[in-house]
Curated annotation (Swiss-Prot):
Record keyword Transmembrane helix present: no
Stated name of the protein: Adenylosuccinate synthetase, chloroplastic
Assigned keywords, A-Z: Chloroplast, GTP-binding, Ligase, Magnesium, Metal-binding, Nucleotide-binding, Plastid, Purine biosynthesis
Additional note from the record: This protein may be expected to contain an N-terminal transit peptide but none has been predicted.
Active site, renumbered: 18, 46
Binding site for Mg(2+): 18, 45
NCBIfam families recorded: PRK01117.1 (NF002223), purA (TIGR00184)
Enzyme Commission no: 6.3.4.4
Length: 428
């Protein structure tokens, strides 16, 4: 199937991640010349399927890699664990997908080392009962190294002595900070000397590349990682990721001006999920949560952890739209709701002081104590996994989508009804 996009586009998560961004990017990628990642790292898990139904779980490689005509770009805003990236590249090659010559990584991108993963675990242990619930992929510590200006960039790997000294400094800083820190820095230096020659063909000035592509009329698709409600500035801080998955991270992470994008697609599940700790107003428990978790197979691509489950939260979705300015939405996993007798949408919050609001609070304590005001809609009790057109959609399923449009003020252009590439209804 093909999408309806004819302009440079950004695909962004509007909830807490795992919305299904990778599938839409995979579908749209066939219409684009460049598919780019702009932030995050291997904490992002994007699952896509080819036309034969073969499954690919990607973490660093952009989801557009299955489009043989697209160049995939890993931008400067991404933190890159090179061994993990090559594991993905090798797995793709074994499956018949060759990334060589079609993928480039920014020379400005910061490297994530195993020491960052070690620090991540030690930091979580320190927090004890106040754990963030990270993926322990080292993302936060890698961005911390970048922010404190002692990080190592991919381009540094070209100078063996400079690279080795920078890594030794990182290790010494970590050893001084954490009593239990154990890391063989010299072995890591040797390991990366071997990696250096292999990564060299992938290293590029991606800022120049994407801007040159734009000047030459090539279409660019940006694949966001994580999601707005995990954004370092706009998410449920401190229960957030360490980058900016919201709109600002695109320009910062690629070096491409905001005005060069016309389309901003927000991806949202027809219900919600969250992995890790943090406030989650519409969270469900008991039989309904268990049923949705099993029907939607809600287990993390990166961690395998069971995801928390909740009803669609329109307060959060409208907040994400306010920040990102979505031109349209992709509502995913609508098929998962097919067995439900009735559905609920959170439309407002009752605050602890008794007032009702449709604004998303910044204060975590407030968020943890709101009462959600729900609107109830009838279910459709019909399997929609094989529906491929809007006209064939059950009336109550249409009503659910149309109500989402009314409450958000944004067109729901793409409607996911299953995991496969073709399981997407494009609303006329």
């Amino acid at each position: 199937m093909r999408g309806r996009e004819d302009a440079n586009a950004r695909v962004l998560g509007s909830q807490w991640g795992d919305e299904g961004k990778g599938k839409l990017v995979d579908i749209l990628a066939r219409e684009y010349d460049v598919v780019a990642r702009c932030q995050g790292g291997a904490n992002a898990g994007h699952t896509i399927y080819d036309d034969d139904g073969k499954k690919y779980a990607l973490h660093l490689v952009p989801s557009g890699i299955l489009n043989e005509n697209a160049t995939c770009v890993v931008g400067n805003g991404v933190v890159v664990h090179l061994p993990g990236m090559f594991d993905e590249i090798d797995a793709l090659l074994k499956a018949g997908v060759d990334a060589r010559g079609r993928m480039m990584v920014s020379d400005r991108a910061h490297l994530l080392f195993d020491l960052h993963k070690e620090i991540d675990g030690l930091r979580e242990a320190e927090l004890s009962g106040n754990k963030i619930g990270t993926t322990k992929r080292g993302i936060g510590p890698a961005y911390a190294s970048k922010a404190t200006r002692n990080g190592v960039r991919l381009g540094d790997i070209r100078d063996a002595d400079k690279f080795a000294n920078a890594l030794r400094t990182l290790a010494a800083d970590a050893a001084a900070r954490f009593d239990g820190f154990e890391y063989d820095v010299e072995a890591e230096i040797v390991r990366y000397r071997e990696i250096a020659s292999r990564i060299e063909p992938f290293i590029a000035d991606t800022v120049e590349y994407v801007n040159d592509a734009h000047r030459n009329g090539k279409k660019i698709l940006v694949e966001g990682a994580n999601a707005t409600m995990l954004d370092l500035d706009f998410g449920t801080y401190p229960f957030v990721t360490s980058s900016n998955p919201a709109i600002g991270g695109v320009s910062n992470g690629l070096g491409l001006a905001p005005r060069k994008f016309e389309t901003i697609i927000g991806v949202a599940k027809a219900y919600t999920t969250r992995v890790g700790a943090g406030p989650y107003p519409t969270e469900l428990f008991g039989d309904v949560a268990d049923k949705l978790r099993e029907l939607g197979y809600e287990y993390g691509t990166t961690t395998g952890r069971p995801r928390r489950i909740g009803w669609l939260d329109m307060v959060a979705l409208n907040y994400a739209n306010q920040i990102n300015g979505f031109t349209h939405l992709n509502i995913t996993k609508l098929d998962v709701l097919s067995e439900m007798d009735e559905l609920k949408i959170g439309v407002a919050y009752e605050l602890p002081n008794g007032k009702t609001t449709t604004a998303f609070p910044a204060d975590i304590a407030t968020l943890e104590n709101v009462k959600v005001v729900y609107e109830t809609l009838p279910g459709w009790k019909t399997d929609i996994a094989n529906v491929r057109s809007w006209d064939d959609m059950p009336e109550n399923a249409k009503k659910y989508i149309l109500r989402c449009e009314e409450l958000s003020g944004v067109e729901c252009r793409y409607i996911g009804v299953g995991p496969g590439r073709d399981a997407m209804v494009i609303k006329p």
